[in-house]
Each structure stands twice: as structure tokens, then as C-alpha cells.
């Protein structure tokens, strides 16, 4: 007799939900470990609980190395998608430029009607405003990504500074113990200030 199928839906009882989360998380991590061993692959698992607690596990390489490789590959895929999107955006502009060029290369360019020229001018202005709007949007996205990188670097800087402070404190404690007659009332050395 096999297991009965469990309907996949949200578990209403909070304690049952927590127990199920814990068991399934451990099962998922175990399966990832098995996949890594059997297939000799690098596997990283990141799970965030409903309460916001982070669980991660990696086998083979360090989890940060695996994520870095993923980001590099994903960035290449995003660049390819971005190029396809740009091509799709430029096709109407290309057609418009070809229309303008054909109008201007007509043998009787002086006989082109005013309405036709006004229409071409409006199309060019529309294309130009769309291009400028897209450029502004891309610049804002770039600025936001730089702000996010700055935030991450500041956080990393704080972590490193606090680690340096702990290491400096440990080193001075060790030095105090090495010298006879040193008092415990020595001044604690200052840590390096954070970069602003």
C-alpha cells in the first residue's frame, strides 16, 4: 500500500504548517545534497520562511561562488533579451527612416506635398520623443542599480569594519596577557572609521 496523495494547498493550522515547512525544507536540502553527490554538480538552495528567516545550503562550491556564476550567466541571458527588445524597438524607427529617405530621394523632391512633409515631421518627432523617454527610463534603471550596489557595499563595509574592530580587540586582549604587569584597565584601541 502506497502513500496517499496530499492536496497541495495552504495549511491553515500554524503549528502544522511550521512542522511541514521544517520537514519539507530538510527534505529539499537532502535532495539537493544527493543531486550534488550523484551528478557531481554544484547545488545551492536558499529558502526563506514565512517569518522571513533565511535558510541556505550548498554542496560542492561555496554558495556565494554558485550565486556569482548564476548572476554572470543570467546577466548574459538578460543582455541577449535586451538586445532583442532593442531590435524590436528600432524596427519601427528603421521603417520611418526608410520612408523619409525614400521621400527625400524622389526625383521630384520639390513636388512633395506640405501635408506629407508635416506627417513625416510628426512621425520623426514622435520617434524622437519615444527614444528620449526610453533613454531616460534606462538611465533611471541604471541609477537605481548603482544605488543598490552602493547600499550593498556600505553594508559590507560595516560588516568588515565591525570584524576589524573585533579582531583588534582580540589582539589587544592577547597582548595584555603576554606582558606581565599589564593592567586590565588599558584603553581599548579605536577602530577605523567607516567610509562615508
UniProtKB/Swiss-Prot annotation:
Would you tell me the protein name for this molecule?
Agamous-like MADS-box protein AGL27
Its BP terms in the Gene Ontology are: flower development; photoperiodism, flowering; regulation of DNA-templated transcription; regulation of flower development
The organism is Arabidopsis thaliana
Report if keyword Lipid biosynthesis is assigned: no
Q: What happens when the gene is disrupted?
A: Suppress the late-flowering phenotype of photoperiod-pathway mutants. Affects natural variation in flowering behavior in both long and short days.
* Transmembrane annotation, as ranges: none
Tissue distribution is: Expressed in most plant tissues, embryo, seedlings, roots, leaves, stems, inflorescence, pollen, siliques and flowers.
Q: What is the lineage of its organism?
A: Eukaryota, Viridiplantae, Streptophyta, Embryophyta, Tracheophyta
Q: List the keywords (alphabetical).
A: Developmental protein, DNA-binding, Flowering, Nucleus, Transcription, Transcription regulation
Q: Where in the cell is it found?
A: Nucleus
Which PANTHER family does the annotation name? SERUM RESPONSE FACTOR HOMOLOG
Query: According to its UniProt record, what is one Pfam family this protein matches?
Result: K-box
Amino acid at each position: 500500500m502506497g502513500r496517499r496523495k496530499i492536496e497541495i494547498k495552504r495549511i491553515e493550522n500554524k503549528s502544522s504548517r511550521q512542522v511541514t515547512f521544517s520537514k519539507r525544507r530538510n527534505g529539499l536540502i537532502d535532495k539537493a545534497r544527493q543531486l550534488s553527490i550523484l551528478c557531481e554538480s554544484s547545488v545551492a538552495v536558499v529558502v526563506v520562511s514565512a517569518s522571513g528567516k533565511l535558510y541556505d545550503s550548498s554542496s560542492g562550491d561555496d554558495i556565494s561562488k554558485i550565486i556569482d556564476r548564476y548572476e554572470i550567466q543570467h546577466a548574459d541571458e538578460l543582455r541577449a533579451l535586451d538586445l532583442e527588445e532593442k531590435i524590436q524597438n528600432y524596427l519601427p524607427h528603421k521603417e520611418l527612416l526608410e520612408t523619409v529617405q525614400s521621400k527625400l530621394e524622389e526625383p521630384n523632391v520639390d513636388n512633395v506635398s506640405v501635408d506629407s512633409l508635416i506627417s513625416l515631421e510628426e512621425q520623426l518627432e514622435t520617434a524622437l520623443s519615444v527614444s528620449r523617454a526610453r533613454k531616460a527610463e534606462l538611465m533611471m534603471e541604471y541609477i537605481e542599480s548603482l544605488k543598490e550596489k552602493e547600499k550593498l557595499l556600505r553594508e559590507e563595509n560595516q560588516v568588515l569594519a565591525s570584524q576589524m574592530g573585533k579582531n583588534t580587540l582580540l589582539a589587544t586582549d592577547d597582548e595584555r596577557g603576554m606582558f606581565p604587569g599589564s593592567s586590565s584597565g588599558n584603553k581599548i584601541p579605536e577602530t577605523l572609521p567607516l567610509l562615508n
